[in-house]
């Protein structure tokens, strides 16, 4: 029977050693689902609220016992006493949103609500004897995503003196996800060799990328290109580059202040100068995607950037859209960006996540399914990427088990789909003139 009989949450740890929420759901028939909730380092101003305890004597204030209690004492009784079916995802998500009653899920916490939402979906898939991607996407879910691999970390994700938060490689020329993953791994290991030869640090950051002290942004890019060529691959054909600039992290009083991360030698740029700078980089290097190139509140700057580069570069809104259909709808209407980053914990339920993906795809925007810097062994985002035919996934570098877990899940899915599996490579960027 599909009736949910038990919902239970506990406090566990994420990849940074910080507490997070784990939720388990059980049905009458014994079907079971478990979900772990991720957490971000750089967060958008308009994201749903991640409820933390604030008790400085426990986990430095980062405990999540309040969120756990909200699941066990408030959400669980509503679900169990209401005799909800595990197959009724939309009704359960809607009930939790109403129970919270706030615009940003600040009462119960998005980390509490999301844990339940995903655990319910996993239990439903278990009940039906289906893999999660098939339960979520039906027979249409068969496209494996191009991995956006963050192999060099800067900004808030490392101590490297570089403002840009992520430098990514995208192996679009591969014939399969399996081959794209191999290319990425070989580039990653060749990059490590190059860094060691230069006497640079090869310790990895939150998302598994290297965080050496490069001589600025272009030094980082040139070194990555060297690693790509060392594998025998061609930049701009086999492999493209991407940036997550996370510009909201260094935007203040109308100025993009690179000195925050790069020291006194860093530039200070107006919105127009920021657009000019990004265009210079695009003209010089094989860049196919730029995330958060402008601040989340600099909509005029975003419009300038979109008008200038929107036909040839994927312009991804992360802090800009925060997986929120209201924000995305406004962006579509104003012609801002051409892609949305999808982070399940930015909005807090699977239903709202899928609504955002569908809205983007209907408008001709791409949807990039994404991890957070504080991750867990949970692989739900891999299944979401295939279920929605998103075509792109951003889940870190080629190290750290919390990142590799998602890649390994995608390998399993590709194997299971066998001849029906699709990998569209460069054609996943249907929002660009190629």
UniProtKB/Swiss-Prot annotation:
It holds the Pfam family Enolase_C. Mg(2+) binds at residues 244, 291, 318. InterPro entries: Enolase, Enolase-like_C_sf, Enolase-like_N, Enolase_C, Enolase_CS, Enolase_N. The active site is at 207 (proton donor), 343 (proton acceptor). Pathway: Carbohydrate degradation; glycolysis; pyruvate from D-glyceraldehyde 3-phosphate: step 4/5. It is found in: Cytoplasm; Secreted; Cell surface. GO terms for biological process: glycolytic process. Its main location: cytoplasm. Binds a second Mg(2+) ion via substrate during catalysis. One of its GO terms (cellular component) is phosphopyruvate hydratase complex. It is an enzyme of class 4 (lyase). It catalyses: (2R)-2-phosphoglycerate = phosphoenolpyruvate + H2O. Gene3D superfamilies: Enolase-like C-terminal domain, Enolase-like, N-terminal domain. One of its GO terms (molecular function) is phosphopyruvate hydratase activity. PROSITE patterns: ENOLASE. Its EC number is 4.2.1.11. Keywords: Cytoplasm, Glycolysis, Lyase, Magnesium, Metal-binding, Secreted. Its cofactor is Mg(2+). The keyword Cytoplasm applies. SMART domains: Enolase_C, Enolase_N. The keyword Cytoplasm applies. (2R)-2-phosphoglycerate binds at residues 165, 343, 372-373, 394. HAMAP family: Enolase (MF_00318). Belongs to the enolase family. Catalyzes the reversible conversion of 2-phosphoglycerate (2-PG) into phosphoenolpyruvate (PEP). It is essential for the degradation of carbohydrates via glycolysis. This is Enolase. It comes from Staphylococcus carnosus (strain TM300).
